[in-house]
Amino acid sequence: MTRHLLTAADLSRDEATAILDDADRFSQALLGREVKKLPTLRGRTVITMFYENSTRTRVSFEVAGKWMSADVINVSASGSSVAKGESLRDTALTLRAAGADALIIRHPASGAAQQLAEWTAAEAGAPSVINAGDGTHEHPTQALLDALTLRQRLGGIEGRRVVIVGDVLHSRVARSNVLLLHTLGAEVVLVAPPTLLPVGVRQWPVTVSHDLDAELPAADAVLMLRVQAERMNGGFFPSAREYSVRYGLSDKRQALLPDSAVVLHPGPMLRGMEISSSVADSSQSAVLQQVSNGVHVRMAVLFHLLVGAEQEAISA
């Protein structure tokens, strides 16, 4: 049966841990290699479909596939028949017919990845679909790389207190992180203005707060979210300056964190708004470590979906 990764809820604790373990193994296997190539996905075709702008996610999926010797093909809306009016369904069926083993999709519509998996389903030869971010819904591989970074920095995730700050309403990263961190045993606190919290958020497995200063001293990690102005139609807060004063991670606020705490950001960062440059570049920041881990996590995800966890992840 074709396997997909559409939401962080698809992963059990054991499955998520296995992916994180294999991500670490891939990292170690590539360490010191002059040529960063493993034969794991030789002969497989991986197609990325990005209908929204992306740097980190698109590049890391491409690098992940190439480091595993897959044939990686990039499809963008502007450079394909989508620009001529072709529907997502017809594009998906075309790529399935062309022999794709995996389709990695980023799309502005929530639920696009699920729809893609349903359209391309077949008795045989259906590609695995990986959600690389669908609207405000989810971004499961981002949650996995964040979890890997936390595990490396903190020594574990069970019982850790993770504070997620900012535009939760429009954040697929927040949704996937809440699901995965809860699965892995972390305590999650959401800090945001009331206007940037989803309806029904108090039914999530989280604590909700509007006071960032009160939450920082007990935090093991802080995940700062970008304000997604491109998804906003109205005034969700009075001004960027007021938002930064109330919810930005400034140098002064960083001093409230324990010395062992970790600062995460999925990027792109709005320096000076949700995070100061000095905090982003400080020793507590794991932003670049997240990027490195993104490649290894996506290697592990491709391996688990296309090869199977029962086979050896690393070979010469």
Swiss-Prot record:
Its EC number is 2.1.3.2. It comes from Mycobacterium sp. (strain JLS). One of its GO terms (biological process) is 'de novo' UMP biosynthetic process. GO terms for cellular component: cytosol. Carbamoyl phosphate binds at residues 56-57, 106, 139, 142, 267-268. Pathway: Pyrimidine metabolism; UMP biosynthesis via de novo pathway; (S)-dihydroorotate from bicarbonate: step 2/3. L-aspartate binds at residues 84, 172, 226. This is Aspartate carbamoyltransferase catalytic subunit. Belongs to the aspartate/ornithine carbamoyltransferase superfamily. ATCase family. It comes from the Bacteria. The gene is pyrB.
